[in-house]
Regions:
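RNase H-like, Mg2+-dependent phosphodiesterase core
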Residues: 1-197
Length: 197
């Protein structure tokens, strides 16, 4: 078993997507991990991100939490993001001594000492590691989901509001995996309603 420092980094991904759950990861890194390539997941190409995620998982104690589209629609994306973070932390097999959280807000009812960091995924290694694991895990999930819904190109856009995704929504409507309360989707649905009047 490797030595660890008991500091956990937590980050979520998928807040800005129009489809799919929001994912979060909590990561406690090994002291021996090579941190050179661990940085904000958004700045790492897809294939390298998958390899880094695998490396981080092998050299850490980690857990992943999610919040569903239904929960996002019901409690809003901020609260759903915090819920996914809480779920990731609750699933950790080791209780950290402190949690470093990306962003301004922390999940409710955390019974662990924590600090929040704006742009923490760019500054704090354990948060960057959590960002990589969360994004790689969500990307793979969306690729698999995209096989069932190929018209929306989720294998390329991962649920984000790209031109091809928005065109897919306009042409084919929405699925149960779409966040119907999000403004771009709401606007498309409203324009379709007006067209039928």
């Amino acid at each position: 078993m490797f030595k660890i420092n008991k500091k956990a980094g937590v980050d979520e991904v998928g807040r800005g997507c129009l489809a799919g759950p929001v994912f979060a990861a909590a990561v406690i890194l090994s002291n021996k991990i090579n941190v050179k390539d661990i940085k904000d997941s958004k700045k790492i190409p897809f294939r390298k991100r998958l390899l880094l995620s695998k490396y981080i998982k092998k050299n850490s104690i980690y857990a992943v939490g999610t919040a569903s589209v239904e929960e996002i629609n019901k409690i809003n994306i901020l609260n759903a993001s915090l819920l996914s973070m809480k779920r990731a932390l609750d699933k950790l097999k080791l209780k950290p001594s402190i949690v470093y959280i990306d962003g301004l807000f922390a999940p409710k009812d955390l019974k662990i000492k924590y600090k929040t960091f704006v742009k923490g995924d760019e500054k704090i290694t354990c948060i960057s590691a959590a960002s990589i694991v969360a994004k790689a895990t969500r990307d793979v999930f969306m690729i698999r989901l995209g096989k069932k819904f190929p018209k929306y190109k989720w294998n390329k856009n991962f649920g984000y509001g790209t031109k091809e995704h928005l065109n897919g929504i306009r042409k084919y409507g929405i699925t149960k995996h779409h966040r119907k309360n999000f403004k771009p989707i709401h606007n498309i649905l409203m324009s379709k309603t007006r067209e039928t009047l």
